[in-house]
Amino acid sequence: MCQEDEYDYLFKTVLIGDSGVGKSNLLMRFTRNEFNIESKSTIGVEFATRNIVLDNKKIKAQIWDTAGQERYRAITSAYYRGAVGALIVYDITKQSSFDNVGRWLKELREHADSNIVIMLVGNKTDLLHLRAVSTEEAQAFAAENNLSFIETSAMDASNVEEAFQTVLTEIFRIVSNRSLEAGDDGVHPTAGQTLNIAPTMNDLNKKKSSSQCC
């Protein structure tokens, strides 16, 4: 096996939200440090990967991006299967994209594992002069629904690294706690397998009390 294909954990993380909110550019910025101002709407599903190291463990982050249009909803179940993290993205300049966050969250919780780590992401902060959704409104929604929250710009890279790292670190923390409680040295899934996490409610309560993003 090639060295770049070796890893201790594979974390599947999904990007969801309305079409045009910048999901594909967030994916490109995090995995390749690129931005395409003429990016077109995703057709179907695509994903990219990036390897990171947390606590001396090699993590392969597999980030999935899907079309936000209704006609692609048939792929929903397969898209969410095995996901341990999710970023719900809206456009801070487009109120309707934020208004639809509740629907995306409902769909996520219907199809994904109940213990998935979720972050609400307000994208396009490079367009602050066009802001339609206040930070306070989004923070309130996130707090009410037990989500972490951050605002980003895929164009100038603001907070993109922090957003993904926060989600991946929280997944890793939960996995590490599960391993410690089981009394073993850590879980090492075979390459190519997605690791499912199942934190207790105590884990989730600790998360809310100990971490607030932005």
From Swiss-Prot:
Binding residues annotated for GTP, in chain numbering: 17-24, 65-69, 123-126
GO cellular component terms attached to this protein's record: cleavage furrow leading edge; cortical dynamic polarity patch; cytoplasm; cytosol; endosome membrane; Golgi apparatus; Golgi membrane; growing cell tip
Keyword set includes Transmembrane helix: no
PROSITE patterns according to UniProt: RAB
Superkingdom of the source species: Eukaryota
Keywords: Cell membrane, Cytoplasm, Endosome, Golgi apparatus, GTP-binding, Lipoprotein, Membrane, Nucleotide-binding, Nucleus, Phosphoprotein, Prenylation, Protein transport, Transport
Predominant localisation class: membrane
Localization: Cell membrane; Endosome membrane; Golgi apparatus membrane; Cytoplasm
Any Pfam family the entry gives: Ras
Membrane topology term: Lipid-anchor
One biological process term in Gene Ontology: mitotic cytokinesis
Function: Has a role in retrograde traffricking of proteins from the endosome to the Golgi. Involved in the secretory pathway where it has a role in acid phosphatase secretion.
Family: Belongs to the small GTPase superfamily. Rab family.
Protein name (record): GTP-binding protein ypt3
Lineage: Eukaryota, Fungi, Dikarya, Ascomycota, Taphrinomycotina
